[in-house]
Amino acid sequence: MRMMRAIKQGQWAILLWPYLLTTSIPLDCRDEQGGLSRCPSISQEKLLDRVIQHAELIYRVSEESCSLFEEMFIPFPLQLQRNQAGYPCITKALPIPSSKSEIQQISDKWLLHSVLMLVQSWIEPLVYLQTTLNRYDGVPDMLLNKTKWVSDKLMSLEQGVAVLIKKMLDEGLMTTTYSEQGLFQDDGQPEMLEYVMRDYTLLSCFKKDAHKMEILLKLLKCRQNDIHSCA
């Protein structure tokens, strides 16, 4: 039954995948020399709209990836224990507001820098995830394609947010000084179940943070229109 649900989800994903690719507006800001010279020609309003659309798609595809991974590899009893597996989210230590009241109180500057911190913190872990998924027997191509797509789009999102910071705040690119040692440390040869739970936690945490990126960017957009009615 679980396998049939996963297959059906995969079929729907295959049907929707071309739509996602064709409706996604490009956000590649880098020129041939690697500089961020393309996006500055876009208006601030349009650039923010593109950044928000990218964040929405990243969250949607991360949600689909997490569900597909869960259906394929996680027995139901372990789904209930995923938060007790000893793998905290890698962005837990970042100084990013989490409650609704905290988010509403922070400045536009901190909204943008919070999004950038989240984006930068997940670029390497998603590359790492693509390598670990190759250990699995029978991993569907759809899952591999989705994680690769999200990884690529996350780097584009970083570029877009960096240009937004330059446009709105007249500041340079900030890099996150966050150590991922806990995620990438060598544990010898852990059991396959440990790999599975670690990757499941990684996907679940990224889905949560991708949603937070979307929320923060939409709040920023709302403030640009009418700061008094944003919730």
From Swiss-Prot:
Disulphides: 29-39, 89-205, 222-230
One cellular component term (GO) for this entry is:
extracellular space
**Pfam families from the entry?**
Hormone_1 (PF00103)
Q: What is this protein called?
A: Somatolactin-2
Family that this chain belongs to: Belongs to the somatotropin/prolactin family.
Whether Lipid metabolism counts among this entry's keywords is: no
Residues carrying covalently attached carbohydrate according to the record: 145
Please tell me in which tissues this protein is expressed.
Pituitary gland.
Keywords attached to this Swiss-Prot or TrEMBL record, sorted alphabetically, are: Disulfide bond, Glycoprotein, Hormone, Secreted, Signal
Classification via InterPro entries: 4_helix_cytokine-like_core, Somatotropin/Prolactin, Somatotropin_CS
Tell me the GO molecular function terms: growth hormone activity; growth hormone receptor binding
Where does this protein reside within or beyond the cell?
Answer: Secreted
Q: Where is the signal peptide?
A: 1-24
| Main subcellular localisation | secreted
An example of a Gene Ontology BP annotation on this entry?
response to nutrient levels
